[in-house]
UniProtKB/Swiss-Prot annotation:
Transmembrane segments: none
UniProt keyword annotations, A-Z: Protein biosynthesis, Translation regulation
InterPro entries: DENR/SUI1_TIF, SUI1, SUI1_arc, SUI1_arc_bac, SUI1_dom_sf
Entry's Gene Ontology molecular function annotations: mRNA binding; translation initiation factor activity
A single BP term in Gene Ontology: regulation of translation
Family statement: Belongs to the SUI1 family.
Protein name per UniProt: Protein translation factor SUI1 homolog
Matching PROSITE patterns: SUI1 (PS50296)
Pfam family, one: SUI1
Signal sequence residues: none
UniProt source species: Sulfurisphaera tokodaii (strain DSM 16993 / JCM 10545 / NBRC 100140 / 7) (Sulfolobus tokodaii)
Length: 100
């Protein structure tokens, strides 16, 4: 996070404020051959930060996935579990929306 956006606040507080401002949408799409893909959108940050979050989610869910166009895509239907993991990462529950 850039220091000038947080007005001299410590980096930890700045990071938490940034997480509280994000509205995250979690949805599942059906792809070819009936395969399901969980898509997480609304996370702001650089590609490196998104890849770090995706990597952590993939290892905890034992699933493959990728980062494309600012969205995290995970193989399989992991909506509820992803919400739990994002809350453990510090994202507020009220900002995480599961789209059915």
């Amino acid at each position: 996070m850039s220091d000038n956006l947080c007005g001299g606040l410590p980096p930890e507080i700045c990071e938490q404020l940034n997480k509280e401002e994000q509205f995250i949408k979690i949805k599942v799409e059906k792809r070819r051959y009936g395969k399901e893909v969980t898509i997480i959108e609304g996370l702001s940050g650089s590609d490196v930060e998104l890849k770090k979050i995706a990597s952590e989610l993939k290892s905890k869910l034992a699933a493959g996935g990728t980062v494309k166009n600012g969205k995290i895509e995970l193989q399989g239907d992991h909506r509820e579990r992803v919400k739990e993991l994002l809350m453990k990462m510090g994202y507020p529950e009220s900002n995480i929306i599961i789209i059915e």
